[in-house]
Structures are given as structure tokens and as C-alpha cells.
């Protein structure tokens, strides 16, 4: 499957950050179609994905069918916030999930992280950045907020976490593409603005927008990690950019 350019850049950064961390047990919250889980599995991790939408759950299981068959991975179609851990995990990660919660739900999510992480575990969040760039995609996806570095770090700190690392990702590529992205989303998905926040959130992991989330096969000649490696280096160079549309954050308990 051909991934969007922003997703490719995010996964490249994640893999680079985790390359020196010994693989262990992970949980991914809101797996969508399972691309981030696939990245972790390829690095030797084993774990569980949680997904509210049954169609996305099936897609994630199919995407990672070899790991499912070998017992290294499963997707549970349940609400993670209401689930107790079988055992602590070494890595707890979510991509474009936290912004779907209101303030109370956001606090509950971060408290649940405390119950799931092992004593030396690491939490990772990828969330929308640059509040100035709020747009149609936030509306149709059921977002409550976009984060600034300051607001994200303040929120984590206030709830007993310490930010170990924070970086802005996909800048400047996603910013250059944003007007086209907004146009494509408005044409394909504007009617979702009339849906409830819950329904918009549920559908956010299974979007099909030609030219944004789905591409003809030949585009894979360009949208791949080899061709996009220079843009990965550029995003690292500009990881301090305030207008970066994605924030990557690693966090641990404040007393560690």
C-alpha cells in the first residue's frame, strides 16, 4: 500500500528514534489500518493494537497477517480506555489520537498510560501541531484541538509526565501541500462536518481521498522512503519549526 508523504516522514522519524531501543512489547492506540504497528513489528517488536472501528480493525489485522499468524500481534476491537493491561508494555504509542478527546478524555487517556507502561516504558504521541493551521481536515476528523509545543508539554507536565523529546515533523513539505490537501478534503468529505464528533472520530481511520490518502500504483515510484530520504533530513533540520503540522513527543513519568 502506498502511504501519504506525511505518514512516510513520520514513520521514518519514529524508526530512527527507536533504532537503539531494544524491541519489547508495545501497545498502539487507534491503529487505523495498522501502518505504524507494521513498522514496529518489522523492527522486532511484538504487541497489541486497539481500534474502535471494526472495519479498520480487520484491515490492520490483514495488513499484519504474518505477525498475527505467528502470535506476535493482535488487534482488539475494544475501547482501550476501558481495558486493563494483561502485563505492562515497554512502548505505548498513538498517532493522531489524543486530539480526538475533550479535556476530560485527554486526562483519562494520559492516566491510562500510567497503568499500562512498565517501570522503564516509553510513551510516544504524534499529534497535530500548529494551531494557526486549523482547517477543514480538523473539522471533518472530529478534532478538539491542534497542539503547540508549549500546550502539549504543559498538559503532560500538569498530569505528572516529563517530556524527554519533542520535535515538529513533516515541515515544510506538509505546509506546502496544505492548500491542495484542504481542497481535496473539502471536495471529498465536507459533509462529515454535520456528523457527531464520535462518528467523525470513528471514521477518521478509514478515509479514502484520492490524491491525499489513496494513490495509483505508479505514485509508489516517488512515495517511498528511498526517494523521500532527503525530505526526512530536511524535516529533522526544521524540527523546531513552530508551524510544523505534526508534533512527535516522547514522555515518561515525572519521577523517573
Placement of each model-derived feature along the sequence:
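Feature marks short, surface-exposed loop/turn motifs that line or immediately flank catalytic pockets
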Residues: 56, 131-133, 170-173
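A C-terminal cap/extension of S-adenosyl-L-methionine-dependent methyltransferases
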Residues: 173-256
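A short glycine-rich, Lys/Arg-flanked "PGG" loop and its adjoining helix->strand segment in the class I
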Residues: 107-122
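Short, glycine-/aromatic-enriched active-site segment of Class I SAM-dependent methyltransferases
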Residues: 123-145, 154
Amino acid at each position: 500500500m502506498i502511504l501519504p508523504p506525511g505518514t512516510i516522514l513520520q514513520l521514518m522519524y519514529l524508526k530512527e528514534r527507536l533504532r537503539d531501543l531494544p524491541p519489547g512489547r508495545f501497545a498502539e492506540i487507534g491503529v487505523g489500518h495498522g501502518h505504524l504497528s507494521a513498522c514496529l513489528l518489522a523492527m522486532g517488536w511484538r504487541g497489541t493494537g486497539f481500534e474502535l472501528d471494526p472495519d479498520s480493525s480487520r484491515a490492520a489485522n490483514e495488513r499484519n497477517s504474518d505477525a498475527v499468524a505467528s502470535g506476535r500481534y493482535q488487534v482488539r476491537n475494544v475501547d482501550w480506555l476501558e481495558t486493563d493491561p494483561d502485563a505492562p508494555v515497554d512502548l505505548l504509542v498513538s498517532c493522531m489520537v489524543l486530539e480526538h478527546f475533550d479535556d476530560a478524555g485527554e486526562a483519562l487517556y494520559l492516566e491510562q498510560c500510567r497503568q499500562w507502561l512498565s517501570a522503564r516504558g516509553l510513551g510516544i504521541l504524534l499529534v497535530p501541531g500548529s494551531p494557526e493551521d486549523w482547517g477543514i481536515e480538523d473539522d471533518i476528523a472530529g478534532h478538539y484541538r491542534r497542539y503547540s509545543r508549549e500546550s502539549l508539554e504543559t498538559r503532560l507536565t500538569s498530569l505528572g509526565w516529563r517530556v524527554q523529546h519533542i520535535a515538529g515533523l513533516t515541515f515544510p513539505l506538509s505546509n506546502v501541500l496544505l492548500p491542495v490537501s484542504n481542497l481535496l478534503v473539502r471536495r471529498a468529505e465536507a459533509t462529515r462536518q454535520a456528523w457527531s464528533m464520535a462518528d467523525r472520530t470513528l471514521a477518521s481511520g478509514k478515509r479514502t481521498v484520492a490524491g491525499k490518502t489513496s494513490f495509483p500504483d505508479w505514485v509508489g515510484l516517488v512515495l517511498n522512503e528511498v526517494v523521500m530520504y532527503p525530505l526526512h533530513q530536511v524535516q529533522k533540520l526544521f524540527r523546531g519549526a513552530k508551524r510544523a503540522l505534526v508534533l512527535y513527543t516522547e514522555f515518561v513519568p515525572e519521577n523517573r
